[in-house]
Regions:
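Sec/Tat signal peptide C-region and signal peptidase I cleavage site
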Residues: 17-22
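GGW-centered surface loops in extracellular recognition modules
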Residues: 24-52
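Acidic/polar N-terminal loop/beta-strand segments that form early-domain functional surfaces
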Residues: 47, 64-66, 82, 105
Length: 260
C-alpha cells in the first residue's frame, strides 16, 4: 500500500510540474501572444482581441525584435501557425528583422489587412502562410527565400504588385491561385513553376519568364481570363498538360525548340 501511495504522489508531482512547464511556454505582452520555441527564442502565436470598452482597438501590429517574460529576454524568430487568422480591423502587420520563418497559415484570412512588412531575413515561408488576405496590395519577397511554397499567396485577390528576389528556385502548387496581380516577371533563377501555380488569376494579362526557367507544370497558367501575352524562354524544357487551358484571350504562344 505504501508503494502505491508513493507512486501516486510521484505521478501527481510530475503532472503538476508538466502543467507548470506548459503554462510557462506561452505568455502575452501588449496583447500579442508568444510561444517559447528555444532557450532564448519565441514565436508570435496569436493576438488578444478581447478589449475593454475603454481600450482602443488595434489597427496596426508592430512586432518587437525582443520581448521579456519573467525577467528573461527572448528574441522573436518566427510567426507560428495561425498566429494571425480571421482578424478584423488590422490594417498592417510589421515583422522585425529577427524573424526568419513564417509557419503554415501564419498570416491567413484577415479581412482588412492591407500591408505586411516582412523581415529582410526571412528564409522560409510556410504553406498558406500569406494566403486569403484579400485586401493585401503589394509585397516584396525577401532575398533569403528560395522557395515559394504551396498556396502561399492563394486568394490574395487585391494583390497588385509582388516583387521577387533574384535567386529563388521554385514556385509551388497553387502558390498564386486566384491572386490579383495584372503582370508578373519571374526571374530565371526559378527553375520550376508548380501545378496550377497561377490558376484563375482574374487580372493577369502579361507574364514574363526569365531565361533559366525550365518547367511549367500541369495547369500552371490555366483559366487566366485576361492573359494576352506570355514570354517563354529558350531554357524551357517541359510544359505540363493544361498549362494554358481556357486562357481565352491568349491568341498565340511561341513554344521554344526542344520543349516536351
Amino acid at each position: 500500500m505504501k508503494k502505491i501511495v508513493t507512486l501516486f504522489v510521484a505521478i501527481a508531482a510530475f503532472c503538476g510540474f508538466t502543467s507548470k512547464a506548459e503554462e510557462a511556454t506561452t505568455f502575452e505582452v501588449n496583447r500579442i501572444k508568444y510561444t517559447v520555441t528555444g532557450e532564448n527564442s519565441v514565436g508570435v502565436s496569436g493576438l488578444n482581441e478581447n478589449y475593454e470598452p475603454s481600450e482602443v482597438k488595434l489597427t496596426e501590429v508592430i512586432i518587437p525584435s525582443t520581448v521579456e517574460n519573467a525577467g528573461k529576454n527572448y528574441t522573436v524568430t518566427s510567426v507560428e501557425e495561425y498566429a494571425f487568422r480571421w482578424t478584423s480591423g488590422i490594417l498592417k502587420i510589421e515583422l522585425p528583422n529577427t524573424v526568419t520563418e513564417l509557419k503554415n497559415n501564419a498570416i491567413y484570412y484577415n479581412d482588412d489587412l492591407e500591408e505586411i512588412v516582412l523581415s529582410e531575413n526571412i528564409t522560409k515561408l510556410g504553406e498558406y502562410s500569406l494566403a486569403s488576405n484579400r485586401k493585401l496590395k503589394s509585397l516584396a519577397i525577401p532575398a533569403g527565400v528560395t522557395e515559394i511554397p504551396q498556396s502561399c499567396f492563394a486568394s490574395d485577390e487585391g494583390l497588385t504588385s509582388i516583387t521577387f528576389a533574384s535567386d529563388f528556385t521554385s514556385i509551388g502548387n497553387g502558390a498564386f491561385y486566384k491572386a490579383g496581380m495584372a503582370e508578373i516577371t519571374i526571374p530565371g533563377s526559378c527553375k520550376t513553376i508548380g501545378n496550377n501555380a497561377f490558376q484563375l488569376c482574374p487580372n493577369l494579362s502579361k507574364v514574363t519568364l526569365g531565361e533559366g526557367v525550365e518547367t511549367l507544370n500541369e495547369g500552371a497558367f490555366r483559366e487566366c481570363a485576361k492573359l494576352t501575352e506570355i514570354n517563354l524562354p529558350a531554357s524551357l524544357k517541359t510544359i505540363g498538360q493544361y498549362a494554358f487551358l481556357n486562357d481565352v484571350m491568349l491568341s498565340s504562344v511561341r513554344i521554344p525548340v526542344g520543349v516536351t
